[in-house]
A protein has these predicted regions:
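Conserved strand-to-loop turn within each blade of WD40 beta-propeller repeats
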Residues: 1-3, 41-44, 83-87, 128-131, ...
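WD40 beta-propeller repeat fold
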Residues: 1-56, 60-63, 207-208, 216-217, ...
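Short C-terminal beta-strands that terminate individual repeats in beta-propeller domains
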Residues: 17-21, 59-64, 101-107, 144-150, ...
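Terminal intrinsically disordered, low-complexity extensions flanking WD-repeat/beta-propeller proteins
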Residues: 144-322
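Conserved loop/turn motif of beta-propeller repeat scaffolds
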Residues: 3, 35, 78, 121-122, ...
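Canonical WD40 repeat/beta-propeller blade segments in eukaryotic WD-repeat proteins
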Residues: 24-31, 67-74, 110-117, 154-171, ...
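WD40-repeat beta-propellers
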Residues: 6-10, 48-51, 90-94, 134-137, ...
Length: 322
């Protein structure tokens, strides 16, 4: 999406149906439940709708934010479009009439980078942010049900490194979420407890290199793109364990290595570090300038006092009578 192109593929048989141009660099996309539209969010804060049944038609503007959009999701019944931006806001709008805002989900303290609506529980929304939290919402009401701070799951509490959520993957069969964080690079496996309306930490998987994507397959296996290799994890006796030399893993890694020039620059592109806003401490700047003014006054007074002392020590010339 960096080259402002939207490519539409048919998977069976595999073929490219269309290549369309977006006005701005895209940040996220979602496909409607009816599979008739692609909703594309971009850096300027707009969402455009692209038809799937008419693969060559241009995009139509759906809605806009005042800030950069980072994530977009659609409710399974296609009633709502949910958008998240760099200014910590999650907006719930009507899909057919986007100017009608149903609710806001407010609570994050940094940019909102990921959104996910579990298909098994369409009334719920899970969001991830640069503040290192995963939050569970009843989005139609804009009410927060639970907040899980990922930094508390790290022994070092992430100290100077911020836990920015990069990816959020859902496993439909088990009500599990896999959360990939930017720094430190790790994957948190969370269980959705619908009755308790909570997200429960199940396991933390430490990444060997620098991971940049995560997903579940149809069999419940957890795939992690770790550096230049795909790694498969499967659950055994309640623990996620790496499965080495899996046949599918070998095939995927062969494709990655044969096309590595295409993938090589992507990990740096998808980093969340440039999304944090600069924190300008006006009080600290005021105090620094005040101290500079006081120091200048003291130096001026010292120099004036020294000049007066020199003048007082000089002998005075009296008048001489002839």
């Amino acid at each position: 999406m960096d080259n402002k192109q939207l490519l539409l593929f048919r998977t069976r048989p595999w073929e490219c149906l269309s290549v369309r141009t977006a006005l701005r660099r895209s940040t996220s996309l979602a496909i409607t439940g009816a599979e008739d539209r692609i909703l594309l969010a971009d850096k300027s804060g707009d969402v455009y709708s692209f038809s799937i049944s008419h693969p060559n038609s241009p995009g139509q503007l759906q809605l806009g934010h005042l800030s950069m959009l980072l994530a977009v999701a659609v409710s399974p019944d296609d009633r709502y479009i949910i958008t998240a931006d760099r200014d910590e806001k999650i907006r719930v709008s009507s899909l057919e009439h986007p100017y009608i805002i149903e609710a806001y989900c407010l609570g994050h303290h940094e940019f909102v980078s990921q959104l996910s609506i579990p298909p098994n529980h369409p009334q719920l929304l899970v969001s991830g942010s640069g503040d290192g939290t995963i939050r569970l919402w009843e989005y139609e009401k804009g009410s927060e049900l639970h907040c899980l701070d990922l930094s508390e799951l790290q022994p070092s509490r992430c100290e100077k490194n911020r836990c920015a959520v990069m990816r959020l993957a859902y496993c439909r069969g088990r009500d599990l979420f896999a959360v990939l964080c930017d720094s430190p690079s790790s994957v948190y496996v969370l269980e959705l407890d619908v009755e308790a309306e909570r997200l429960l930490h199940q396991q933390t998987i430490m990444v060997k290199q620098r991971a940049w994507d995560v997903t579940f397959d149809d069999c419940g296996g957890l795939w992690l793109l770790d550096g230049d290799r795909a790694v498969l994890y499967q659950q055994h006796e309640g623990r996620w364990q790496e499965i080495p030399d899996h046949p599918d893993q070998t095939k995927i890694n062969e494709v990655i290595h044969s096309n590595w020039p295409v993938f090589e620059g992507l990990p740096s592109v998808i980093s969340c570090r440039n999304l944090y806003k600069m924190n300008i401490d006006n009080m600290a700047e005021y105090r620094m300038k005040k101290e500079q003014r006081i120091d200048q006054r003291q130096k001026k007074r010292t120099s004036e006092f020294a000049a007066e002392s020199r003048d007082s020590k000089r002998p005075r010339m009296g008048a001489v009578k002839m």
